[in-house]
Amino acid sequence: MKTQVAIIGAGPSGLLLGRLLELQGIDNIIIEAKSPDYVLSRIRAGVLEQGTQNLLREAQAGERMDREGQVHEGFALSFLGRVERIDLKALTGGKTVMVYGQTEVTKDLMAARAASGSVSI
């Protein structure tokens, strides 16, 4: 049986889904109403949790993220003159977050899609 999937939207989620399906041999097409330049102009969040980092690596689209992203193992809270550091890595069994902009994630996924010859319209 041959499976084909249509994905609506070429944002990070749609592009990541398309890439993961492609790597499993599942044909897919991404349908986006806006131009690639418009999609890349949408500036949004830029903190990636561990699961998202892992998925980007699994999708073979995490190389630049690993080079350029800023890993954070914790953060500080300040209240009434007292500062407490929250050690995310220690409290979560080694998980971290990474600062790497959504626009950069989208660029990486678009590049991987273009390199593979997969179709987006």
Write out the residue ranges for each language-model feature:
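A secondary-structure boundary/capping signal
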Residues: 8-11, 32, 101
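General small-molecule cofactor/ligand-binding pocket signal
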Residues: 121
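Beta1/beta-strand and adjacent pyrophosphate-binding region of the FAD-binding site
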Residues: 1-13
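Active-site-adjacent segment of FAD-dependent monooxygenases/related oxidoreductases
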Residues: 40-44, 49-116
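Glycine-rich FAD pyrophosphate-binding loop
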Residues: 22-43
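Glycine-centered short loops/turns at secondary-structure junctions
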Residues: 9, 25-27, 117
